[in-house]
Amino acid sequence: MQRITITLDEELLDVIDRRVATQGYQGRSEAIRDLLRAGMRESEALPDDAACVAVVSYLYDHSTRELPRRLNQTLHAHHDLTRSTLHVHLDAGHCLEVSVLQGESGRIGELSRQLMVERGVEHGQVQVIPAPGQPKVR
């Protein structure tokens, strides 16, 4: 096993610490490993060429330099996947976007990752559902 260093904001660290306390982990490392494993399982659930629908949601700080423009460009570059998008102004500095996507699992995963790794995106989640007629993932 290798030791690594990561940087987390205080709020995220508080969430992890609460998870450690409430779920009985021995420490942060095991809790973070479990979260990473769950995220990797979710992203590997469907073959890249499987047809699916998905909901991607993310909260971001719209004052982050050029972030709204970059997010918009990313969505436009994948316009063929986007069925609908909802944009909500949560407060003076934060927006929530929810997009319904349809297409191949690999392309949807790529788009979701591009959106969520942008600096200034604070929370992101994607839920992928096999399209009607596709085999269910176990």
From Swiss-Prot:
Belongs to the transcriptional regulatory CopG/NikR family. GO terms for biological process: response to nickel cation. The keyword Metal-binding applies. This is Putative nickel-responsive regulator. Gene3D superfamilies: ACT-like. Chain A, domain 2, Met repressor-like. NCBIfam families: nikR, PRK02967.1, PRK04460.1. The keyword Metal-binding applies. Transcriptional regulator. Keywords: DNA-binding, Metal-binding, Nickel, Transcription, Transcription regulation. Its cofactor is Ni(2+). Ni(2+) binds at H76, H87, H89, C95.
